[in-house]
Amino acid sequence: ERVTKSSAIFDYDKLNWLNQHYIKTKKISEIANMIIPYLNQLKIEVDDRTYLENILSLGVERDYNLKNIANSLTYYFIDKIDYNNDDYKKLNMENSKPILEKIIIKFEEIDFLDQSIINNNIKQVCEELSLKFKDVGPVVRFGLTGRLKAPSIDELCFILGKDRSLERLNSLKSFIS
């Protein structure tokens, strides 16, 4: 009797928020189970479940659905990063080469046993080059992922490991040469 005849409004923002909240409340192992089919659709096979769970622990709460989360994880699983994208155009590549050279030298000298070691070396590079992190961070993050938006650099390096991190940074250095 008291139902209106007007159409209901479906609020996608609220739905996305609710979905994001639901994802946040799940255990990482459950999210891993749910996300594997989405990764498979992207032609990514997950061989190491612990690796996937470590990646997911960096911040699944940043996205609001599993498809977006899967898309945001692709750089962890691919061997070659495509640097020729819109984010590349946003970087100042003239200043990037000395940053990359210095960070590569620093990373070659250390072991990636702890995130704080990685973080301290990034700070040292900033000091040695008389730059702020906002100048160094985006270049390193882009070198590791091909994107400007990603988890923190020390977390990325720790998950990717020393060899893959150095390989990607050297790859960007070659790309801009």
Where are these regions (language model features)?
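Small-residue-rich helix-loop
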Residues: 28-131
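Short, hydrophobic/amphipathic alpha-helical patches that form generic packing surfaces
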Residues: 17-21, 58-64, 75, 138-145
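Charged substrate- and nucleic-acid-binding regions of tRNA-handling and nucleotidyl-transfer enzymes
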Residues: 115-176
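Charged/polar, low-hydrophobicity segments characteristic of intrinsically disordered regions
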Residues: 8-14, 170-177
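Short helix-capping/linker segments at secondary-structure and domain boundaries
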Residues: 24-28, 67, 146-153
